[in-house]
């Protein structure tokens, strides 16, 4: 994961939300914009739960990102957790990520 920077400011997140393509799953939403460098952000709102649940949701999403890092095209990503994420098995979440990854690769940029 060398060379990956995190999105830090509201402006950076808003840029990805407005200009990016949203890929929805029952457990998370992935916003993506092709770019020349790899930047990543993780979001879990209070709808997901209290701080402990939100942090766990972000850890699960980070684990997904690390697992698929080599297969992801370079760009800016924002993973947004949904409340169902915490009740789901990691295997099921992994399957959803595989589907989204295929959709990203099929799309013509």
Curated annotation (Swiss-Prot):
Q: Can you tell which superkingdom this protein's organism belongs to?
A: Bacteria
Report the Gene3D superfamilies cross-referenced here. Answer: 3.30.230.10
The keyword Protein transport belongs to this UniProt entry's keyword annotation: no
Q: According to the UniProt record, what class of enzyme is this?
A: hydrolase
Question: What are the UniProt keywords, alphabetically?
Answer: Endonuclease, Hydrolase, Nuclease, RNA-binding, tRNA processing
Q: What family does the database annotate?
A: Belongs to the RnpA family.
Q: What does this protein do?
A: RNaseP catalyzes the removal of the 5'-leader sequence from pre-tRNA to produce the mature 5'-terminus. It can also cleave other RNA substrates such as 4.5S RNA. The protein component plays an auxiliary but essential role in vivo by binding to the 5'-leader sequence and broadening the substrate specificity of the ribozyme.
One of its GO biological process terms is: tRNA 5'-leader removal
The UniProt record lists the keyword Amino-acid biosynthesis: no
The EC number(s) given in the record are 3.1.26.5
- Protein name listed in UniProt: Ribonuclease P protein component
Catalysed reaction(s)? Endonucleolytic cleavage of RNA, removing 5'-extranucleotides from tRNA precursor
SUPFAM superfamilies reported for this sequence: Ribosomal protein S5 domain 2-like
Subunit-structure text: Consists of a catalytic RNA component (M1 or rnpB) and a protein subunit.
> Record's GO cellular component, any one?
ribonuclease P complex
Q: Which HAMAP family match?
A: RNase_P (MF_00227)
A GO MF annotation of the entry reads: ribonuclease P activity
